[in-house]
Amino acid sequence: MPMRSLVTLPDPILREVSKPVEQVDTALQELADDMLETMYHAKGIGLAAIQIGIPLRMLVIDVSGNAEDTQKKPLVIINPEILWLSDERNVYKEGCLSIPDYFAEVERPKRLRVRYQNREGKQKEIEADDLLATCLQHEIDHLDGRLFIDYISRIKRDMVIRKFKKRAKEKNTQEAVL
């Protein structure tokens, strides 16, 4: 299982709307394994395919908080569709593997129900609350070209985007020198 490179802000692919998965096959299952390995290595709890540059409606999540292989409880979610969101809301301090080292409080519905296909292509539904609900919404947002910084004030969002554009420019300058 090769680890994949993470796409980070300001890469415009993060704003693309991902396309539905047409067929669940061995290649897609291998992609799911690569995504899980990448997510665990980066110490994340969720990863959308678009975050590794693949615009497919697919994500992986593991909010178990266990670092040991025997304790992991990964979810592979293909073509997710939110069926219901609660009126009750939660606030979590969110971060993102595509926006490293930046965190902000985001308010989202506390509970939701999602229909999806699992890694074998079987239709499933999950009802989630609290951290899992927040993580599902965060990752599904990626599939629709939205980032968690879209939920913070415009001033803060613009500041974050400028910071990451500057960081990318400095990185490109350093690479050109080498």
Swiss-Prot record:
The answer on whether this UniProt entry bears the keyword Aminoacyl-tRNA synthetase reads no
Question: What are its cofactors?
Answer: Fe(2+)
Q: Which Gene3D superfamilies is this protein grouped with? A: Peptide deformylase
A GO molecular function term, named singly, is:
peptide deformylase activity
- Biological process (GO), any one: co-translational protein modification
What this protein is called in its record is Peptide deformylase
What's the name of its gene? def
Protein source organism: Bartonella tribocorum (strain CIP 105476 / IBS 506)
The answer to keyword Coiled coil applying to this record is no
For this UniProt record, give its keywords in alphabetical order, as a comma-separated list.
Hydrolase, Iron, Metal-binding, Protein biosynthesis
Which cysteines in this chain are paired by disulphide bridges? none
Q: What does this protein do?
A: Removes the formyl group from the N-terminal Met of newly synthesized proteins. Requires at least a dipeptide for an efficient rate of reaction. N-terminal L-methionine is a prerequisite for activity but the enzyme has broad specificity at other positions.
